[in-house]
Amino acid sequence: MHISSMYTKGALLAVCTLASVPSLSSGQHETHSTVMSSGWRMVPMDMNMPMLPGLEGTVPAVGPFMPGMMVDPATLPEARPSRLVPLADMDTLDISVSMVRRTIAGHEMIMFGYNGQYPGPLIQAPKDATVIVRVKNEIEMPTTIHWHGVRIANRFDGVPGVTQEAIRGGESFTYEVHVPDAGMYWYHPHVREDVQQDLGLFGNLLVTSPDPDYYGPAHREEVFVLDDILMDDQGALPWGEESPTHALMGRFGNVMMVNGETDHQMDARQGEVVRFYLTNVANSRTFNVTFGSATMKIVASDVSRFEREQLVNSIIIAPAERYVVDVRFDEPGEVAIANTIQAINHFRGEFYARVDTLSVVTVDNQSADPGVSRAFETLREHTGVAEDIRPFRPHFGRKPDHELVTTVKVQGLHPSIVLSMESDTLYAAPMEWNDAMPMMNWLSTAEEVTWILEDMATGAQNGEIDWDFQVGDIVKIRIHNTPDSFHPMNHPIHIHGQRFLVLSMDGVENQNLVWKDTAILPVGSTMDVLVEMSNPGEWMIHCHIAEHLHAGMMFSFTVTNQLP
């Protein structure tokens, strides 16, 4: 069964809807009171971005959803911080999916959690181990767990209707998670990610290498899970019930968090080298992470180390990507870890600098071990990565096997939105760092917006695309992000079950390669990727902006074992 039969555009079938969950009309939290008879609350607006004429009182074409509408938050356990769970080969971990109580920016809310934690447990396992994860679903929504980036056996990939049936409330499913590659991975649902992931269902999986010198020396390691959430003075804004809202740009939050904290802080010593494992779990936001005056070098990304370490000023990390960076804090004082972007105001036709603090590091004047501090100066060459890539180099310069183009079509959007979008000439900005049109974005749902991946050779779109490969195939794919669609937007492209190299962007060759499972494609750009088809099964390719996924931007391909 191909994915199109499960992820039906608009309807999204039972496992991908919230229709079985009590609607807002059945009850409200005190902190989730409505301001409209429909149950919706007005999306927070920037005072510099006026509402379009004719949109007053307009609400999305779907019903609002909030979790646990008949539940008293006081009866739920308060979410706990993530805990490290070291596992050996063939160890078993039980995970429950349940409602939890969270307080964010002063608002008490019902959210979801894995084992009552927010983020979920940090699972640690050695490379080449297999760990058993037994999942019990204790929420009303069906769910699954997708082991993002892991080249896992297909039947455990967590895609409803393709690799398994969704885990309904009260039911369980057992995953066998084999981890062939060292690095930082993460796990999350593949049922209405726009809701479940945003409500807290995510966690990291750290796969350790047997090589003690796999990464360079560091005084310590920190895991940073980057996220945002959309809130007003009542708490979290409702999600779409029948299908997602925010289908044009994805749901940007206005409150940013590190490891679920809005005021994250940490301490460091002068000269201390801290290894940061960064994961972006936001629905739509791409972060540009800076570390103030500290010195940063990039070490690894999704599925491997880079060919060589490199000093950088910032890290652009799209939804679902991971990066490993080493940072040395040279001077005492406070260092702000920030999201530093060039935001856009479409109404005024202006770009402006915006800096949002994610965490504050207080560096004292006690010196860290100087040997590790000096070792940071060395930019290491990862010869093992270069040797791993070497057999693929003969394929770099050849013509692409497949070409895709991204676009969008709309039907039934409010005429004021259509007129405004068609008259705006600024939408070719390479990256949408912020929600520059919150009202229009909120009103657009997956009922009216279809995001498209189109096979340029056949004209097939999304679920119509039907690619077949053999294990061992090396496939070059060229992806174009057209700048002249109704609303061009950057897309983090995720390929399940395999690994790939980003060979070039806009014809400029990548001089420092790393194995990836997700890569950002800016507006107007063309990206060449080389995919190693090593893992048999039926696998997804999709945009990892959650709302774009559920607005159709996905298809599946099949990898089969060659006959003996």
Which residues are covered by each model-predicted region?
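Asparagine-centered strand-capping/turn motif at beta-strand->loop junctions
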Residues: V135-I139, L278-A282, I479-P483
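Bacterial N-terminal signal peptides that target proteins for export
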Residues: H2-A11
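Bacterial N-terminal signal peptides
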Residues: G10-S20
